[in-house]
Design a protein with these regions (language model features):
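Domain-length accessory/inserted modules outside core catalytic folds
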Residues: 1-113
Length: 113
């Protein structure tokens, strides 16, 4: 089990979530099969979203930090920290805000669309 950051569709809804990367947790949390949006430059933080879902997903009302600020995401966003061996490691909301505190907005991904 590893802690990750879940950015739900609702504005400002950012939380810690504990997941099993090799189990069905990714499917359950993303509400479908997952795909990668990308990785923040100079970090080991990868960004995932739902690729295919049987559920009705909504546009995520939160903005990611640069260079992903303009990325339009349907459904939840999951941030996973990977170590130098590409193994997932704990990453919390507090870690996320510390990492991106130099961004222009007070809360890097809580600004409405």
């Amino acid at each position: 089990m590893v802690n990750c950051v879940l950015i739900s569709e609702e504005d400002g809804n950012i939380s810690d979530v504990e997941i099993n990367i090799v189990g069905n947790d990714l499917y359950r949390i993303l509400k479908g099969t997952g795909t990668f949006i990308g990785q923040f430059p100079d970090t080991n933080i990868v960004i995932m979203k739902c690729d295919v879902s049987y559920f009705e997903l909504f546009e995520n009302r939160n903005k990611l930090p640069e260079p992903f600020r303009e990325e339009v995401v349907i459904g939840p966003i999951l941030l996973i920290y990977m170590d130098e061996d590409a193994e997932p490691r704990d990453f919390t909301v507090l870690d996320y805000f510390r990492q991106f505190s130099s961004e222009s907005s007070r809360y890097p991904c809580a600004s409405s669309v």
